């Protein structure tokens, strides 16, 4: 299916804003609606269906909206967002995190510690609703809840970022665009901002669980100093430099990081896969015969090359990989930061590390094991 044929949706921020408007309509105009139109900060209007509205008292109402992310994969898709509005005479708009909505506990995010994890975009949209409905002296407390939020939060980076108790209510435009790779990439960046705000001098980048487990369990690096990159290693390198890191350590499986050595910084197999070609090239530089090169070339996965490299005395390939990956990574970010590389097996055993990784490890007091 083409992207242009796919259905868009709306964010959790739009759900909460729509729920707020439906609740105020019920309280102030005695109007129970099944849809509302809200305005985003860019001046666009979004129609959002309302699942239910309940008047709790003369000053309190709750509206429920089912999150619809369209054709964009999203952990919150199909889940209810409940917004309770409570009228008061403070003249102010206040926000509270209900069940399943997180609270910020670390600096470096869009909202300061102690605040509900309701981002500036949704707050701005709710402020527009507040200004539309509330007269001078009338105040509203908006409590946003997501019944399944604590479970959903485990599938997000919230705990790593320091958001505890549930998911975040997000959205800058209120609209979810289908197949939003940019949106996913941008969701990774706050990890780096939190690390910097908490005084980390080195950014440790891990594509996935293998690198993360090694960093934490073997090297003694705290998980708060690590950022997951998924396949977007190049993007996260650029972001780390932009945020101000001068030292970057990348830890991961050789099958992923060998791609950096050949200059491929989007590491999804569909985008870049020259693993065997690279191993053969480095093996040849180590003196491998044509027959051995052909044997290596016919391997389907990098792990299958290990016994051959060991048998032929070609394990120097691993050092060539990390040295080249470090050089190419530093070149990728115009040498604005020092980049160290550590490559591992699927079991998390270290195969090699370059000199920058050793230097960074010493500065960070990591438990660097001896490699034979």
Could you tell me what each predicted segment is?
Residues 99, 162, 230-231, 364-368, ...:
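Proteins with a high burden of low-complexity, intrinsically disordered sequence enriched in S/T/G/P/A and R
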Residues 7-13, 161, 167, 172-191, ...:
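A structural signal for small-residue-enriched, beta-sheet-centric alpha/beta enzyme cores
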Residues 1-155, 159-161:
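Generic N-terminal targeting/processing segments that precede catalytic cores or assembly contacts
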Residues 105, 152-154, 215, 260, ...:
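Short acidic, gly/pro-rich beta-turn/loop elements at beta-sheet edges
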Residues 88, 123, 322, 326-372:
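Extended hydrophobic packing segments that form well-structured cores
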Residues 78, 82, 218-221, 354-360:
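Surface-exposed flexible segments
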């Amino acid at each position: 299916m083409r992207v242009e044929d796919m259905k868009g949706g709306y964010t959790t921020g739009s759900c909460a804003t729509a729920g707020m408007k439906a609740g105020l309509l019920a309280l102030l105009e005695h109007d129970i609606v099944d849809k509302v139109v809200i305005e985003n900060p860019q001046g666009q209007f979004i129609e959002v269906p309302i699942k239910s509205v309940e008047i709790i008292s003369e000053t309190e109402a709750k509206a429920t909206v089912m999150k619809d992310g369209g054709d964009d994969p999203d952990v919150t898709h199909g889940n209810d967002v409940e917004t309770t509005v409570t009228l008061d005479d403070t003249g102010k708009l206040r926000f509270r995190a209900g069940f399943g909505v997180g609270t910020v506990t670390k600096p470096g995010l869009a909202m300061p510690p102690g605040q509900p994890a309701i981002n500036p975009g949704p707050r701005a949209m709710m402020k527009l609703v507040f200004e539309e409905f509330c007269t001078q002296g009338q105040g509203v407390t908006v409590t946003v809840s997501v019944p399944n939020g604590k479970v959903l939060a485990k599938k997000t980076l919230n705990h790593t970022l320091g958001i505890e108790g549930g998911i975040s209510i997000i959205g800058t435009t209120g609209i979810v665009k289908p197949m939003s790779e940019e949106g996913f990439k941008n969701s990774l960046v706050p990890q780096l901002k939190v690390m910097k705000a908490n005084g980390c001098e080195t950014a440790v980048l891990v594509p996935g669980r293998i690198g993360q487990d090694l960093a934490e369990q073997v090297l003694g690096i705290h998980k708060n100093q690590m950022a997951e990159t998924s396949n977007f290693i190049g993007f996260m390198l650029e972001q780390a430099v932009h945020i101000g890191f001068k030292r970057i350590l990348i830890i991961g499986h050789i099958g992923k990081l060998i791609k950096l050595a050949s200059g491929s910084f989007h590491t999804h197999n569909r985008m870049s896969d020259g693993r065997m070609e690279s191993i053969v090239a480095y093996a040849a530089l180590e003196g491998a015969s044509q027959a051995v090169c052909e044997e290596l070339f016919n391997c389907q996965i990098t792990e299958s090359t290990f016994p051959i490299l060991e048998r032929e005395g070609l394990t120097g390939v691993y050092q060539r990989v990390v040295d080249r990956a470090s050089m190419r990574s530093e070149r990728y970010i115009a040498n604005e930061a020092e980049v160290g590389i550590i490559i591992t097996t699927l079991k998390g055993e270290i195969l090699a590390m370059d000199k920058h990784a050793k230097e960074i490890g010493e500065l960070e007091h990591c438990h660097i094991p001896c490699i034979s």
